[in-house]
Regions:
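Residues lining hydrophobic/aromatic ligand-binding pockets adjacent to catalytic sites
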Residues: 1-173
């Protein structure tokens, strides 16, 4: 079993963001944004971020198979999620594409200290929370980086249930 970190870039400066990653010993950053760019914060565009991380000795990888912004299926049974984007992501988590993305993430995490990154500052407002549920349900440790000195171990999201040893977001609807 491995430990995986998560972080949101938020509105931080490039320097502050790199300092936070270095403080937590991050060696590889896995970008799970579906669209790895930012008009407001160009330091987090894929090319700029990759360059600044390389200068700091941190490897950058984009992992679109774990990207967010997924629409729910019409027949979605993940009704514990009221938010349609989270329900859509829960549907995506049931695909081979998602599972292969997680397998590759874990392969990297077995060899290096990895953080999964998206834009949202707090993990509970981001699809990182669902990735974290999946990892935790499969016996891995997930730590959310909040700032340079603060991390939080992932608690399951309120929508998550473990049923017969499997993560489920089935609701009462």
């Amino acid at each position: 079993m491995v430990t995986v970190f998560t972080v949101g870039h938020s509105t931080r400066s490039e320097e502050e963001f790199v300092k936070i990653l270095k403080a937590h010993g991050v060696e590889v950053l896995v970008d799970v944004r579906s669209f790895p760019g930012s008009r407001r914060y160009p330091q987090f565009n894929r090319a700029a971020l990759s360059e600044s991380l390389a200068e700091a000795g941190i490897e950058y990888r984009h992992e679109p198979r774990l990207g967010g912004r997924r629409a729910p299926r019409a027949d979605s049974h993940n009704t514990a999620w009221r938010n349609p984007q989270f329900r859509g992501y829960a549907d995506h988590m049931e695909t081979e594409v998602f599972r292969k993305g997680v397998e590759d993430l874990l392969e990297v995490a077995r060899e290096a200290r990895v953080t999964v990154m998206c834009a949202e500052a707090v993990w509970w407002r981001c699809h990182r929370s669902l990735i974290a549920d999946y990892l935790k349900a499969n016996g891995h440790t997930v730590l959310h980086i909040l700032d340079e000195k603060k991390i939080e171990e992932h608690p399951f999201t309120p929508a998550a249930r473990i049923v017969d040893g499997q993560l489920s977001y089935r609701g009462l609807l």
